[in-house]
Amino acid sequence: MNEWLAGQIVHRFIQFSRGERILGYLKKINQIPHLSTDRIKEMQLEKLQKTLKIAYNNIPFYRKLFDESNIEINNLRLPEDFEAFPILDKDTIRVNYSDIVNQKIKKRISKELTSGSSGNPLTVVKDRDKSAYARAVMYRCYNQYGIEIGHKQARFWGIPTSPKYIFKEKFKDEIANRIRLSAFDIHEKSLVDFTDKIKKFKPRYFYGYPSVLHKFATWILDKGHDLKELNLLAIITTGEVLYNFQRQAIETAFKCKVVNEYGCTEIGILAFECSEGNLHIMADNVYLETVSSNKSKITSQIIATELNNEYNPLIRYNIGDMGVISECSCSCGINFPVISSLAGRDSTFIVTPDDRYINDAILEYTFAQGIKQFRAVQNSRDSLDIKIVRRPELADRTMDEYKKKLVKYLGTSIKIQYEFVPDIEPEKSGKLRYFISNIE
């Protein structure tokens, strides 16, 4: 579709029909990231107090929790007082979801399903006003790289299997001016198909899982293909932890900057990478905090509270990720705090029999040259099964060095089994995780 038509006509019509004020919000919030740090903190506190008051006065589930926690919402101090409020997990939200609704607000809503990396997807109900603000935040992020509403997107994502949802997603892709390249079935023929479709469609930017984009990139490099004529504005990765080796391969293959997006279906974009490489928290839409985990002394659990949702706000919601939040002076001009370290799901730690928790990034650092792809699965504390797709140039001696290095990090109490395979299939979600922990 013509980009002007997609952005100026189709998008505006859809926005109007859904009752979403995306463009209005976008104009209103554009300069917020450049406010002073003190003003941003004041704004967060004001929004948080408003959210808590609405939740207390209109949502019985939250009123009960506030009363039990003895929280005085009229004189809230951050973060001291807020820490008394219990942390909610996905199971708690799922069980009580119908009660976490402001019955005084009658709005049109939409439903979305989380990807369910934990195996338990959550149906999320969103009111259109909340969705509009979240989308405005998204476009504000994308605007940093010259991406405008209506620009063509190549989306490396999952494809529904139900005929009903296949039609729905195709319609959404059409009006969003994007093509969808399946993350579910990646092989030689599909990668050739990716290339042909991309050349014909001429997208302005890529969006998708880093593991899928990395696999496409390594194939492009192996085949000697050249797609630099696309002149992409950016390649946005999301849905998984982005590893350095993935970033390097993708940028080399497509001659374009990779930008990391961190978010969740429940809330939207939580943080976005700036031109200087910092992952800035969208502090006008979400309040993020970290809580120390018993599992790791290095990183902490990321806890999120929505700031613009009067209908069914998530308050102190455990995202399920681990990270470190810090304030820094960034030369990009954005004064939002940053996530200085993001470890992904708290299940992405290799657990040893002697109760050590080792971030799965150790696998990335161990398997460097000569390995095309790998997946490690831990089913018990004393075992780790690793599948490896090796490149022709991987010498046995080099592989032996990798094995010794991993033993050095993990110790001898954990038995490591290796299997060389021709390919590694993605999961049902379309993601290609490099480490899967099945330890409770």
Regions found by a protein language model. Name each.
Residues 1-113, 119-134, 139-152, 195, ...:
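Nucleotide 5′-phosphate-binding alpha/beta core
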Residues 153, 178, 258, 288, ...:
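Generic structural signal for residues in well-ordered beta-strands
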Residues 138-173:
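Conserved AMP-binding loop of ANL adenylate-forming enzymes
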Residues 206, 310-311, 315-412:
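AMP-binding/adenylate-forming catalytic core of the ANL superfamily
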Residues 50, 159-282:
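Conserved adenylate-forming
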Residues 55, 114, 153, 206, ...:
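Residue-level signal for inorganic ion chemistry
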Residues 136, 189-190, 321:
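Active-site glycine-rich loop that binds ribose-phosphate moieties when present
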Residues 233, 242-329, 346-348:
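Conserved AMP-binding/adenylate-forming
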